[in-house]
């Protein structure tokens, strides 16, 4: 397969720059297992779920990972913390006219100074003078995606975060979860739909373009995930009842499928660079709540694996014609796993 097979033209004005006025006031494109398309509103999601179904949500919390500082020479430095590796250490991407070398210092606001320890491939290991998360809360900015063109605001700090975010560590939001508010979660609970949690700390690699021509040549970035024992038990109970496992977002799906490498989902903590493309056989997830993804992206390949390439092409063409809003602050899809998972 060629990466060009996953390209499409998107009018720039369909890229959502701001969230809807009310969380959850989004549209929902329902794609059935047979490939039928239905235009709905996100508030209708409970009508698509049964009492025996299980929603699995990613409870990662976005950190203020973007930092601005100066080198001792006075040169400006922009940092994006990719991963917190210890209480006082982190790995970061650094943008500067001349990259600071090991032993150099980067000065942030309020006389906070970071020590450059060493390089690890494209990342730089940094030592912080105080706990990393404290420094980020004090000096950092929310790392909005590159296609959102405004500087982060207080509204973004609230809305670019799920209402159930709990585990700090992501540099991008698990955006399918942004549609859920407390009222929706209450409705689902009343209906008997259960929820469970996984954690996958979304890395900056989620925004990196695929730079190769052939899909098979792409190398995925690695991300940390946790699947609790309680979630594994909930999945087993759901299977016993005949219900569906519904992943909220591609990050939840990737965590569950990574933890299912043996054939069934297992509890644990790990790293995954799972790359899901058409032809992949899904082991755990039966349905998926997701946003609309970027052209030529690995996430578009993932949903094409889930629903079929031609079905996703039709769905995206329909969404563009009907002026759905795209990407992080955009509208959602509810995908039922294709009856036959084939490359077509």
Curated annotation (Swiss-Prot):
Associated pathway: tRNA modification; tRNA-queuosine biosynthesis
GO biological process terms held by the UniProt record: queuosine biosynthetic process; tRNA wobble guanine modification
Catalytic reaction equation(s): 7-aminomethyl-7-carbaguanosine(34) in tRNA + S-adenosyl-L-methionine = epoxyqueuosine(34) in tRNA + adenine + L-methionine + 2 H(+)
Species this chain originates from: Thiobacillus denitrificans (strain ATCC 25259 / T1)
Cell compartment(s), UniProt: Cytoplasm
Gene3D superfamilies cross-referenced by the UniProt entry: QueA-like
Protein's name according to its UniProt entry: S-adenosylmethionine:tRNA ribosyltransferase-isomerase
InterPro entries given in the database record: QueA (IPR003699), QueA_dom1 (IPR042118), QueA_dom2 (IPR042119), QueA_sf (IPR036100)
Subunit structure: Monomer.
Keyword set includes S-adenosyl-L-methionine: yes
Family membership: Belongs to the QueA family.
GO MF term set: S-adenosylmethionine:tRNA ribosyltransferase-isomerase activity
The keyword Cytoplasm appears for this protein: yes
EC number: 2.4.99.17
Keyword terms, alphabetized: Cytoplasm, Queuosine biosynthesis, S-adenosyl-L-methionine, Transferase
Organism ancestry: Bacteria, Pseudomonadati, Pseudomonadota, Betaproteobacteria, Nitrosomonadales
Role according to the record: Transfers and isomerizes the ribose moiety from AdoMet to the 7-aminomethyl group of 7-deazaguanine (preQ1-tRNA) to give epoxyqueuosine (oQ-tRNA).
Top-level division of the source organism's lineage: Bacteria
One term under GO cellular component: cytoplasm
